[in-house]
């Protein structure tokens, strides 16, 4: 069954080009277009698309307001188009808070001169978002909750961590690779327990990797951590260079722990989360120092979860607690394999709470996950495991 898409943009040129690009994919059909947020709501109610592409700056009603209304009235995955500026980043993060699932840079030059590149990225995202939404029955409730949630505060005061009801972990059987060091071999029990309480350990580092759906997921996890959280954290979110600084600033305002965009030479310390800068790679060494490297064009992801996880395995051995959250693709799987070989712990987000069950699924299918947790429980379990 073809994916039904509603295209929303006040630019006639952009609307036509996006429609042409999507229509060239045999798995996608554009069922309608809209020129502003008000029309988008009307068309969404009438056409019931599987996915909506949405501009944010439009007359009559902006994209963020439209997303909030859509999530409350007819929850539908929304892919935002955003300008690659600091202000564009701020607005895009507001849209993700409102319930949008992902975003793409709005680049008129690319869509004019390099439509094949845009087609590959846009169609891949549309198809992945649609597949994930069809698998999951929880999108509507989660999206409505996002739309009803208050916007991010503008003050720099630390926000109180939300409380969540305990939920059961679903540990998975893990086979340690044959190359794992014998002293650090990590095996799952033959009959895994269903207890929600993770094993406590003196972790020296918590490493979290994510992609599509990650901004909201990271916010949900990190706001549950106390200021006294005893381990340093490194965060790897697939995101353009113009966005990561704004995202780190937003998290810092929302969380009790401190969050900043990582810089070369930063020192890891308890209660500080360092976010990998967009367009670059982040590594950690055994002295607790962060190294920021230029993005390698041979790698699909900049930043790349595998790169950071691999450096953590080399530098900290069995003292890393890694978490793979929602995201497309399989980034993080090979890094998690190295962590497992070193004896470290790997968690994955469960399918039901993922926007895109790609990266966590890769971990689970490779039998690398020590436990699978719902998004709402990961923050609480981090506290239980590390305190």
UniProtKB/Swiss-Prot annotation:
It is an enzyme of class 3 (hydrolase). GO terms for molecular function: phosphorelay response regulator activity; protein-glutamate methylesterase activity; protein-glutamine glutaminase activity. It catalyses: [protein]-L-glutamate 5-O-methyl ester + H2O = L-glutamyl-[protein] + methanol + H(+); L-glutaminyl-[protein] + H2O = L-glutamyl-[protein] + NH4(+). GO terms for biological process: chemotaxis. Its EC number is 3.1.1.61, 3.5.1.44. It is found in: Cytoplasm. Its main location: cytoplasm. Residues 148-183 have a biased composition (Low complexity). Belongs to the CheB family. This is Protein-glutamate methylesterase/protein-glutamine glutaminase 2. The lineage of its organism: Bacteria, Pseudomonadati, Pseudomonadota, Gammaproteobacteria, Pseudomonadales.
């Amino acid at each position: 069954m073809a994916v039904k898409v509603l295209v929303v943009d006040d630019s006639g040129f952009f609307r036509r080009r996006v429609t042409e690009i999507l229509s060239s994919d045999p798995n996608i059909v554009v069922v309608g277009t809209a020129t502003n947020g008000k029309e988008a709501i009307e068309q969404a109610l009438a056409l019931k698309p599987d996915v909506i592409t949405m501009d944010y700056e439009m007359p009559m009603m902006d994209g963020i307001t439209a997303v909030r209304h859509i999530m409350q009235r007819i929850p539908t995955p929304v892919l935002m188009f955003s300008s690659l500026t600091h202000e564009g980043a701020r607005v895009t993060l507001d849209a993700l808070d409102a319930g949008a699932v992902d975003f793409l840079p709005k680049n008129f030059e690319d869509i004019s001169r390099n439509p094949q590149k845009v087609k590959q990225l846009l169609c891949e995202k549309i198809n992945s978002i649609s597949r994930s939404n069809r698998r999951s029955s929880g999108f509507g409730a989660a999206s409505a909750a996002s739309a009803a949630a208050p916007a991010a505060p503008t003050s720099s005061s630390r926000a109180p961590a939300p409380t969540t009801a305990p939920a059961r972990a679903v540990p998975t059987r893990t086979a340690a690779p044959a190359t794992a060091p014998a002293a650090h071999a990590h095996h799952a029990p033959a009959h895994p327990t269903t207890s929600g309480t993770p094993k406590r350990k003196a972790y020296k580092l918590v490493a979290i990797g994510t992609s599509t759906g990650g901004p909201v997921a990271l916010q949900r996890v990190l706001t549950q951590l106390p200021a006294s959280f005893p381990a340093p954290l490194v965060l790897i979110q697939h995101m353009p260079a113009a966005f990561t600084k704004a995202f780190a600033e937003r998290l810092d305002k929302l969380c009790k722990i401190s969050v900043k965009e990582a810089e070369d030479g930063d020192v890891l310390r308890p209660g500080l989360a360092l976010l990998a800068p967009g367009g670059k790679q982040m590594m950690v060494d055994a002295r607790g120092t962060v190294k920021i490297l230029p993005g390698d064009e041979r790698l699909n992801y900049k930043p790349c979860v595998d790169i950071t996880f691999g450096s953590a395995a080399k530098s900290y051995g069995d003292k890393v607690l890694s978490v793979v959250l929602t995201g497309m693709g399989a980034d993080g799987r090979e890094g998690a394999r190295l962590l497992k070989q070193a004896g470290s712990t790997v968690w994955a987000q469960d399918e039901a709470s993922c926007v895109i069950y790609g990266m966590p699924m890769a971990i689970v299918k490779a039998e690398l996950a020590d436990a699978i947790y719902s998004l709402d429980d990961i923050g609480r379990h981090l506290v239980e495991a590390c305190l």
